[in-house]
Regions:
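N-terminal secretory signal peptides that target proteins for export/translocation
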Residues: 1-3
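Beta-strand-centric surfaces of beta-sandwich/beta-rich domains
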Residues: 23-286
Length: 286
């Protein structure tokens, strides 16, 4: 049975130097995390911590994905959006719901502090006009506020938001939020977010802003296409590089029409990166 697998590989030789791991024992900080924002090749790294998202989604399975919080704050009129355990960092905050201009205020309590280290209303923190929360790392766009300014913490981070006044009909305000958290391995040294930011952190964020504003991807290296006539063969490539396209062409003329769906389910695509003995990708062709 004939099957052709086509793989288009575009190597990114020059720019890949930025993909090296950080020295062992180096502390995670705003500056080190901002360096990753300035290097799009970090997106392809598999050795990075998982990301967990805390959101206002409808816990009943419905479509009312607003107004759901972790719990009430000890301060009346405030809600706890997330109570995170360290070490770790928040990589993204997204918020919407202030349709009438209500200045929802946020509080960020780091490492068990009783006084918020960082606080401000949604426009100040995520509107893209106040340092270091400047566009395009933080911005108001399409009725939403967001920030990619990293917020590292050694012991923990509690994020609270002002609930706001009720709507005219007495129903709770429709507040939507997303908070992306990455937990770090226990014992990882972390420089907790400081306010005001040290100059080193400000400079790193400015570099990331410049890269994002330029909207320039790493220069492509040599492109080559590999065709495999035998489905049992494995294609191997030396890195660094990027796979841009996978194309599969079964010899349909030799497969009865009633068997084609089953064949697509039986054929498995397996991809392993960087010498791993485990599949990073394993899925049926169809």
């Amino acid at each position: 049975m004939k099957h052709v697998w086509r793989i288009l590989l575009a190597a990114v030789w020059a720019a890949a130097a930025g993909c090296g791991g950080r020295p062992a024992g180096e502390a995670a900080s705003v500056a080190s995390l901002a360096e990753r924002l300035a290097d799009p090749l970090w997106l392809a790294r598999l050795d990075q911590p998982d990301t967990r998202m805390h959101t206002s989604y409808d816990r009943t399975g419905g479509n009312n994905d607003y107004g759901t919080f972790l719990r009430d704050s000890q301060t009346p009129g405030w809600k706890v959006l997330a109570d995170l355990k360290g070490p770790g960092f928040v990589s993204r905050v997204w918020f919407t719901g202030a349709k009438d201009g209500y200045p929802h205020r946020f509080r960020f309590y780091f490492d068990g502090e009783e006084t918020p280290r960082l606080e401000g209303d949604v426009k100040e923190l995520f509107g893209g006009k106040q340092a270091p929360f400047l566009a395009p790392l933080a911005e108001y766009n399409n009725y939403c506020w967001y920030s990619f300014v990293p917020l590292p913490y050694a012991k923990g981070l509690r994020i609270e938001c002002e609930e706001g006044t009720r709507d005219a009909d007495g129903s709770p305000r429709k507040v939507y939020y997303q908070i992306s958290e990455s937990a770090l391995p226990r014992g990882t040294p972390v420089e907790t977010f400081a306010w005001p930011l040290p100059e080193r952190d400000v400079a790193a964020l400015e570099q990331a802003r410049a890269v994002w504003a330029a909207k320039k991807l790493p220069e492509a290296g040599e492109r080559r296409e590999t065709a495999l006539a035998d489905w049992s063969q494995a294609a191997s490539f030396a890195g660094p590089g990027t796979i841009h396209r996978l194309e599969f062409e079964p010899d349909w003329e030799k497969i009865p029409e009633e068997s084609r769906d089953a064949a697509l389910r039986d054929w498995m695509v397996s991809i392993r990166y960087d010498g791993s003995t485990n599949d990073s990708v394993r899925m049926p062709l169809g």
